[in-house]
Swiss-Prot record:
Entry keywords, A to Z: Cell inner membrane, Cell membrane, Membrane, Protein transport, Translocation, Transmembrane, Transmembrane helix, Transport
Taxonomic lineage from the root: Bacteria, Pseudomonadati, Pseudomonadota, Gammaproteobacteria, Enterobacterales
Residues covered by region (Disordered): 39-88
Protein name (record): Sec-independent protein translocase protein TatA
Gene: tatA
Cellular compartments annotated: Cell inner membrane
Compositionally biased region (Low complexity): 49-62
Family the UniProt entry places it in: Belongs to the TatA/E family.
Transmembrane segments: 1-21
Length: 88
């Protein structure tokens, strides 16, 4: 009831052929095939690069954080309050 039958698909295909012509559809099909081939090729190249990069990442470097030194030039909070009182 809600599906598309074979006869409806044939009617749609014949309308598409009449509208676009066989040459244009043939060119469209070859372009689609070439793009799928290129996609598969790039995916296989990506798999090869990830396998070599995983070998490199297995030897991680040891990163150490630099020691945090407290700042010696901090003024006492009492001195800061006294300076504020002098300005008032």
């Amino acid at each position: 009831m809600g599906g598309i039958s074979i006869t409806q698909l044939l009617i749609i295909a014949s309308i598409v052929v009449v509208l676009f012509g066989t040459k244009k559809l043939r060119g469209l099909g070859s372009d689609l095939g070439a793009s799928i081939k290129g996609f598969k090729k790039s995916m296989s190249e990506d798999d090869n690069t990830t396998s070599t990069s995983s070998d490199k990442s297995s030897q991680d470097a040891d990163f150490t954080a630099p020691p945090i030194e407290p700042k010696a030039n901090l003024a006492c909070p009492d001195e800061a309050k006294n300076k504020d009182k002098e300005h008032v």
